[in-house]
Amino acid sequence: LVGGAAIEGFRDRLYAHAVQGSPPKPDFPFPLRYEGVYRERRKVCGVQLYQALGISREDRASAAQQSLENFRFFGAPHVALITTEDELGVYGAVDCGLYVSNFMLAAQNLGVASIAQAALASYPDFIRDHFGLPPNRKFVCGISFGYADPAHPINSYRTARATEGESTTWIE
């Protein structure tokens, strides 16, 4: 967990690293493309996000700037950096997913807002170097958290959720 003075230095350095155009090199590859329902959900989420922020579809510069806000943790005062041991392979990442879900549910129960951020996984070498982590610690994602600003436009919408029928197969 990073907060206080430590997060400010980290935020500034990570943002500068991203702004300079460093190519992403995640420990776990990002999807090459999204197809079908995943593509549609991603598109709808993006449209809602940019509409809430007043960014038009044609305004690529503002959209790019908003994307870079990932590397400033969207202004959150804290970030949890989620890593796993290389030796655990994909199952270590699965365990991390379970941890992230529980972390976020616990935070919500305490009135703390959070956002899981895969974008932070773009620069694992930078993060390992910044915090002196060994190379066998593989970076999965970050969770930025703090108290939400209800007046911020980003908090004015919620993404849709898949129905039970879309996400669950019952076998009897």
Region roles according to the model:
Residues 1-172:
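Acidic, surface-exposed loops and disordered segments
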